[in-house]
Amino acid sequence: MIISFISKELRDNAINEFLGMQNLAPMSLMILKTILTSFSVAASLNDLPRFLIERIIYTSENNILCMFGDFVLHFIIAHEEPPRAQDGTIDWNLISRLQLIYVGEKNAS
C-alpha cells in the first residue's frame, strides 16, 4: 500500500526517528513505526495483520482511523478516483493508496 503524507512536517515526524522522538512518546513512536511498516508492505487493508485490521474504524466514506488506546492515525483515500463497488460505495478491498493526515492523541485539541 502506498502511504503519502499531507505535509512534509508530518512525514518527517512519522518517519524520522529523531524528529519523532521530539514530538511523540517512545511507545507511540514504536506503535507508529509498526503501523507504517505494516501499511507499506500490505497491498490493501485486507492484507494488514489482524491486530491492525481490528483497530481500523471507517469514519466516513473516505476516512479511516487506526487507534491504539488514545493514540490515533487518521488516513484518507489518496486515489484520484477511488475504486467503487457496484452499489457505488468505496470498495475498500481495492484501496491501495492512503494519505496520512494526522498522528497523535485521539482527544487532542
Which residues does each predicted region cover?
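Enriched for short, Lys/Arg-rich terminal
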Residues: N63-S109
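Residue-level marker of positions within ordered structural domains that often coincide
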Residues: I15, S44, E80
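A short, surface-exposed loop/turn module that caps and links secondary-structure elements
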Residues: V41-I64
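Arg/Lys-rich, positively charged N-terminal/basic patches that mediate binding to nucleic acids
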Residues: M1-T37
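Alpha-helix capping and helix-coil boundary motifs
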Residues: A25, S44-L48, I90-D91
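Short linear functional motifs in flexible/disordered or boundary regions
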Residues: Q22, F51, A85-D87
